[in-house]
Regions:
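Membrane-interfacial loop-to-helix junctions in multi-pass transporters
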Residues: 135-139, 200-213, 239-253, 284-290, ...
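Hydrophobic transmembrane alpha-helices that form the pore/transport pathway of multi-pass ion
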Residues: 234-302, 308, 312, 321, ...
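Transmembrane alpha-helix interface/packing and boundary motifs in multi-pass membrane proteins
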Residues: 221-225, 256-265, 297-303, 443-446, ...
Length: 655
């Protein structure tokens, strides 16, 4: 039996020690376009390494001594990034195998650097003639916009290109549009002047955040990965829950929650921990569709888990106008509720199929793990402490980088060599490219929205569609975020929905942080929402399951993420908004009880298998507890209490 299981795991492209076959790696890279960059050999690899090292050192320098003037910082950031994108996402991959750059890619890389370098060289002149766009400026600006769009196609994907082009077209064809969507229209000169030569477009807030906070946090994550912190998380999760019913699946949930504290990518999280946890779940007896779904749901939650959430969380702090630490504090309780919801789903599935955990004798002892690997958590603890102490995210991330290198030196088996430190600089720069280009693309969207006023028009249209019905407006906003999230990266998705949908919610009295967090959540959860569920597709690629069924199972497990945003809009106290200890506790407890009911309904199990009526009652009772009114809370508790009692006594009789 063990041999059959082993063969089954290996057939899906994962060996016993978690190593993935080339075919599986290729599949996963296709799903995670941002990490699907070329691996050159020879002199080309050295050229890439030098550019990446210079890029990372520039970011570290400005992090240490302070960012340069906004436009200069962002232009240098874009110059490095866009050059690397054209070299690392080549026209013809056959040239990569031969260890050569394609001449077209080299030419495009040079061409793409000309617009930001033009701004750097002519910076003082551009300031003196602010608002005046010369013919040369127009040509350079058009070139810059076109090169960014092509870079986005290469490293982010076609959907964001389509969205950006739609907004650009809207800017041009405003006079020909019907009704409230019509506007005077923008000339090429006006559009280029606004999008490329101000800090309202390409070089706007998203690029500003990318060139300061985000890059350094990605670099910090690269060094934490080099130390082996991911393995420490899996070992700790094994010690906590490996022995319990359905142990390996619970290990996946806990390790992904911990991994999410340092990573902001759903697919990367699935790939990072799924190669170990998914085979473990399959060996225990979980169906391959469910095993892939567990990892997908847990890994997607990583972007919701502080202190390092997705790149969009840094943008949220800027858009809302609050310190990043306030976003982190607001996100803590909802993130914990989400992972409890996934954990409950896993637990009920294990009980339903009588799946046992790993014997304690086969698990590593707590003491040994902490003794050998505990020092790896020092950087994470330090960065939380620094953020809580009032350090800016940029300074905290910079300190975290140096602390991660220093703490790794405490034991010989984790000590970094000079080549490891250099490799961290290279990996950090490569890892930042997708976010960088997504931010520059998102900047164009913001530029068109602010220049044409379409944001307010669409927000008003959303309110009209919902006919002033608050719940219907929330539902329309949710659908918009989910649809955008199916093909557009979280960063761009958040930018679009926060400029269009969030104002509609705010106009009806929703606190600004709650409105932004609402669209943020649904943009992320799109990664497990069929039909385009990238995290679920990655999980199914490792498990060998059906992508669509894996996505459906992941959505069931992650049902909390579809409910929690409604909770913090209806009860903003859960985000710490105008909250007292009593109100936060009450909202959290009722939401938690509701989560038990909804998870039980999704899986069809509590103490024993639930029938259709019980599942409907569990769902209804759980949803009642979302509404903050006392009446609905009482109804929810009574309904759930009745089902729990029926289940309990029926399970006793069956024994």
């Amino acid at each position: 039996m063990a041999d059959l299981e082993k063969k089954n795991v290996q057939a899906e492209g994962v060996s016993e020690n978690g190593e993935m076959s080339e075919e599986l790696q290729k599949k996963l890279k296709e799903l995670d376009k941002e990490s699907n960059t070329a691996e050159y050999k020879g002199i080309c690899a050295k050229v890439i390494a030098v550019i990446c090292i210079c890029f990372s050192l520039f970011q570290i320098y400005t992090g240490f001594f302070g960012a340069l003037d906004a436009m200069i910082q962002r232009c240098v950031h874009l110059s490095f990034g866009i050059c690397l994108v054209y070299l690392l996402c080549p026209t013809k991959k056959a040239w990569v195998k031969e260890g050569r750059f394609h001449p077209i890619d080299v030419a495009l890389a040079v061409l793409a650097m000309i617009p930001p370098i033009y701004i750097l060289v002519n910076y003082q002149q551009l300031i003196l003639r602010a608002g005046t766009v010369t013919p040369t400026d127009t040509v350079i600006g058009v070139l810059g916009i076109v090169m960014i769009i092509e870079a986005a196609r290469r490293i982010v994907g076609l959907p964001i290109v389509i969205v950006v082009c739609c907004f650009l077209a809207y800017g041009f064809f405003g006079p020909y549009l019907p009704g409230p969507l019509a506007h005077r229209g923008l000339t090429i000169k006006q559009m280029v002047g606004h999008l490329f030569f101000t800090t309202e477009g390409v070089f706007g807030i998203p690029m500003g955040v990318s060139s300061t906070f985000i890059f350094l946090f990605i670099l910090f994550g690269a060094y934490l990965e080099k130390t082996g912190l991911g393995k420490f998380f899996i070992d700790i999760a094994n010690a906590i829950a490996g022995w319990a019913s359905g142990g390996p699946a619970k290990v996946a949930v806990i390790s992904s929650a911990l991994q999410g504290t340092i990573s902001g990518s759903s697919v990367a999280n699935v790939v990072g921990s799924g190669s170990f946890t998914i085979p473990m779940m399959k060996k225990l007896g979980y169906h391959k569709n469910f095993a892939g779904a567990v990892e997908a749901a847990a890994s997607t939650g990583g972007q919701l888990m502080p202190p390092i959430m997705g790149a969009a969380a840094f943008l949220m702090a800027e858009f809302v106008g609050i310190p990043y630490m306030e976003v982190v504090k607001a996100a803590i309780v909802p993130a914990i509720l989400y992972f409890i919801g996934v954990f409950l789903g896993v637990h009920f599935e294990a009980k339903k199929n009588n799946l046992q955990g790993t014997p304690r004798s086969e698990l590593p002892p707590w003491g040994k793990i902490l003794k050998e690997e505990g020092h790896l958590a020092i950087p994470l603890i330090a960065i939380i402490g620094l953020l809580a102490s009032g350090y800016t995210p940029m300074k905290a991330a910079l300190a975290g980088i140096f602390i991660s290198i220093a703490s790794a030196m405490l034991r010989a088996n984790t000590r970094m060599s000079i080549s490891d430190i250099i490799d961290g600089l290279i990996k950090g720069a490569r890892g930042a490219l997708g976010v960088l280009i997504a931010c520059s693309s998102a900047g164009m969207i913001i530029g068109i929205v602010t220049k044409t006023g379409v944001g307010l028009k669409l927000a008003s249209a959303l309110v009209d569609i919902a006919a002033g019905n608050f719940i219907l407006l929330l539902f329309c906003t949710m659908i918009t975020s989910l649809i955008l999230g199916m093909g557009v990266p979280t960063t761009a998705n958040y930018v679009i929905t926060s400029t269009i949908a969030a104002p509609a919610l705010i106009s009806l009295g929703v606190p600004i942080l709650a409105a932004h967090m609402f669209v943020f959540y649904f943009g992320i959860i799109a990664d497990i929402t069929p039909p385009v569920a990238l995290a679920a597709f990655a999980g199914s690629a490792i498990s060998g399951g059906d992508p669509l069924k894996t996505g459906v199972n992941a959505s069931k497990l992650g049902i909390a993420a579809f409910i929690i945003p409604y909770v913090f809009v209806l009860s903003p106290e859960i985000l710490g908004i105008n909250a007292t200890l009593f109100s936060v506790t009450e909202t959290t407890i009722t939401a938690l009880i509701g989560m038990v009911g909804v998870s039980g309904a999704m899986i069809g199990q509590l103490y024993c298998k639930a029938n259709i009526l019980e599942r409907l009652l569990l769902l209804a009772g759980g949803l009642c507890l979302i509404d903050p009114t006392i009446l609905t809370d009482i109804i929810g508790v009574v309904v759930l209490g009745g089902v729990f009692a029926m289940q309990y006594f029926r399970s006793k009789k069956s024994k």
